[in-house]
Regions:
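Short, conserved loop-to-beta-strand elements that form functional interface hotspots
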Residues: 110-119, 123-156
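C-terminal edge-of-domain segments
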Residues: 155-171
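Conserved alpha/beta core of the MobA/IspD/sugar-nucleotide pyrophosphorylase nucleotidyltransferase superfamily
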Residues: 1-20
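Glycine- and Gly-Pro-enriched alpha-helical subdomains that act as flexible
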Residues: 63-105
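Acidic-glycine-rich active-site phosphate/pyrophosphate-binding loop
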Residues: 23-40, 132-141
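A short glycine/serine-rich beta->alpha loop
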Residues: 41-51, 79-83, 151-155
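Short alpha-helix carrying the canonical HExxH Zn2+-binding catalytic motif
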Residues: 53-64
C-alpha cells in the first residue's frame, strides 16, 4: 500500500475529532505582569481576576470543555474560595484529565489575544514555549496571534485584554 493513499473502509478509519471555541477577558489593575499562556509578561499591570486571570489558558479550558459539551470554566471552577488565586496551568491540568477520561486528547490550538499594550511580539516565543510545555503539543500545533483593537473600546483604552481560542480534540 501507499501511505498517501488514505482510504476509509470501516468506521474506525474515520478520525473522531471535536472542535471547541473559548473566550476570556479581564480588566487590568496595577501589578507586576500579565499571565498569558502560562508565561508572565512583564509590565505594570496584572489581570483583575479571581484566579491568576490567564486569559489564554482560561479560554483554552473553555474551548476544550465546549468541544465535549461539558459546560465552561465557571461550571467546573466557580468563583469560590476553593479556586481563589488558582493558576491557569493547574486548572488546565484538571481539565485535561477530564478530557482524557472521555477518551479524547488535545491535538491543536489556535489562539488570538487582543490587547493594546504590552506588545506581545517580543514575548511570542516565550509564550509558545510555555504553551508547548503545559499542553504537550508540538509547536506546529500551536497557533498564536496577538492583535490590537485599534484603540477602540475597553481594550483600545488599555483597560484590559481578551482572548479567543479554538481547540481540536481527537479520540
Amino acid at each position: 500500500g501507499n501511505r498517501s493513499n488514505i482510504k476509509i473502509t470501516v468506521q474506525e478509519d474515520l478520525l473522531n475529532e471535536k472542535i471547541g471555541n473559548g473566550f476570556d477577558s479581564h480588566r487590568f489593575m496595577t501589578g507586576d505582569g500579565l499571565m498569558i499562556g502560562g508565561y508572565k509578561v512583564p509590565c505594570e499591570h496584572k489581570f483583575d481576576a479571581h484566579s491568576d486571570g490567564d486569559i489564554v489558558l482560561h479560554a483554552l479550558i473553555d474551548s476544550m470543555l465546549g468541544a465535549l459539551g461539558l459546560g465552561d470554566i465557571g461550571t467546573h471552577f466557580p468563583n469560590t474560595e476553593k479556586w481563589k488565586d488558582s493558576e491557569g496551568e493547574y486548572l488546565f491540568k484538571l481539565t485535561n484529565e477530564m478530557i482524557l477520561e472521555k477518551g479524547y486528547s488535545l491535538n491543536q490550538i489556535d489562539i488570538i489575544v487582543i490587547l493594546e499594550e504590552p506588545k506581545l511580539n517580543t514575548f511570542r516565543k516565550n509564550i509558545i514555549a510555555s504553551l508547548k510545555n503545559i499542553t504537550g503539543l508540538e509547536e506546529s500545533n500551536i497557533g498564536f496571534k496577538a492583535k490590537t483593537s485599534e484603540k477602540m473600546g475597553f481594550i483600545g483604552n488599555n483597560e484590559g485584554a481578551a482572548c479567543f481560542v479554538m481547540a481540536k480534540l481527537t479520540k
